[in-house]
Regions:
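Ampipathic, surface-exposed secondary-structure segments
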Residues: 11-20, 37, 117-125, 223-235, ...
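Hydrophobic, Leu/Ile/Phe/Ala-enriched alpha-helical segments that form helix-helix packing faces
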Residues: 26, 30, 44-47, 56, ...
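Generic detector of short, locally flexible boundary/turn motifs and exposed helical patches
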Residues: 34-50, 134, 139-144, 265-267, ...
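Hydrophobic alpha-helical transmembrane segments and their immediately adjacent juxtamembrane loops
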Residues: 295, 299-393
């Protein structure tokens, strides 16, 4: 059995503006931003670049080869595809690791530094870990050979479809494509679209999980009914961090809708690619619906965090007000005692008793304030919440 190619890839939201910046960096190690030239040179050198081309295939892209035999294609919407044609059946997993290692340790650090200024990318914001789909392309393999590949790599098969031009077996991480008569270009176009789809869905799924986690953490605090004074600042700081992350991710979610129409238009204009996607059961409408669902859900998350922030800010204000009142009482007691002392003598005299009296008065004031602070920190404040109305008529 001949294995002709292996692919991996990823997707980060980009535009043709960033693509031109990538092109300048790849060609001349140049950037218009305030980045260290020495680092730019080091990152570019580490890419081991051979030839560089700028082309258009539905979208603009940059393509370059490397001294390792790995080819890289970066599209204007941020889709990144890497492949390695120097692959055999015996060295399959080593060849895949080679591509993944280049992606993680050569290409990604270079692009991360190139775009290190400005808002963080979605994968950093959401803590998204790369779980690559591996695409293994075979030439005219038998059904038994394809099944053997599946057994060696996956515990279960998700789906399989076949026609006169190709067969596709999909597991969890691996796609096995048996190319019968289809051109390499068409196979690659299908792989590009599948990587975009998986990455898009993966980001949305992570945002769904973040919504669940944040909602649950806020609910845990509210379910306690009371919170100690010393914990209020900790909770408000945590909520501020949630709010900041949520607002940044919100901007990225709103961007995602701009990429679907372009990809959909390009795919549907290519009859063979449209057929490929149709057979695999993919619908762009489903992706749009899922995005819209996450957008509505994210709006709810923002509102929920905002309401929790207002609630804890109110409690924080109450604690501050009580602390000020306590300090006022202690200060008034100290001042009153000092004034009474002045009335006991016709004129003040410097005596050992006076010094001790002043020291004791100061100690009492300091001790009183400490005690009040301890009481304030340990005092529990009500965290009230309005219950859901379950019987709306």
């Amino acid at each position: 059995m001949k294995i002709s190619n292996v692919y991996i890839g990823g997707w980060f939201q980009r535009t043709m503006l960033q693509l031109s910046e990538i092109y300048d960096f790849l060609r001349e190690s140049k950037s218009e931003l305030n980045l260290e030239q020495k680092k730019l040179d080091e990152y570019r050198k580490n890419l081991l670049i051979g030839n560089i081309n700028y082309g258009i295939s539905g979208e603009e892209y940059v393509y370059f080869t490397t001294a390792l035999g790995i080819n890289v294609k970066i599209f204007e919407d941020g889709l990144i595809i890497l492949n390695n044609k120097s692959v055999t059946e015996d060295t399959l997993f080593t060849d895949i690791d080679k591509v993944q290692d280049y992606y993680e340790n050569n290409l990604s650090p270079a692009l991360n530094y190139l775009f290190s200024l400005g808002a963080p990318v979605p994968k950093e914001l959401a803590g998204i870990k790369n779980v690559y789909p591996y695409f293994v392309v075979c030439d005219k393999a038998t059904q038994e050979q394809m099944q053997d590949l599946l057994v060696r790599t996956e515990k279960q098969k998700y789906f399989e479809f076949k026609n006169d031009k190709y067969n596709v077996i999909r597991g969890d991480k691996y796609y096995f494509i048996n190319n019968k008569t289809q051109s390499d270009e068409k196979i690659e176009r299908y792989i590009e679209e599948q990587i975009f789809i998986r990455e898009f869905k993966g980001q949305l799924h992570r945002y769904l999980n973040i919504h669940r986690i944040i909602w649950e953490k806020i609910d845990e605090v509210k379910e306690n009914s009371k919170v100690k004074g010393k914990d209020i600042v900790k909770f408000t700081t945590k909520l501020e961090a949630y709010a900041k992350t949520i607002n940044l991710i919100d901007g990225r979610i709103k961007q995602m809708g701009t990429y679907i129409p372009t990809r959909e238009k390009i795919a549907k204009s290519d009859e063979e690619l449209a057929e490929f996607l149709e057979i695999s059961g993919y619908r762009y409408e489903t992706l749009k619906d899922t995005l819209q669902y996450i957008q509505y859900l994210w709006s709810m998350t923002q509102n929920y965090v905002s309401a929790a922030q207002k609630q804890f800010e109110g409690i924080k204000s109450d604690v501050t007000s009580k602390s000020v009142n306590s300090l006022t009482i202690v200060t008034s007691m100290s001042a009153g005692a000092a004034i009474l002392g002045l009335f006991q003598k016709s004129k003040p005299e410097f005596t050992i008793f006076g010094v001790m009296y002043f020291f004791i008065l100061t100690l009492v004031g300091w001790g009183s304030q400490k005690i009040l602070n301890i009481i304030s920190n340990k005092q529990k404040y009500d965290v009230t919440d309005v219950e859901y109305e379950k019987d709306i008529k």
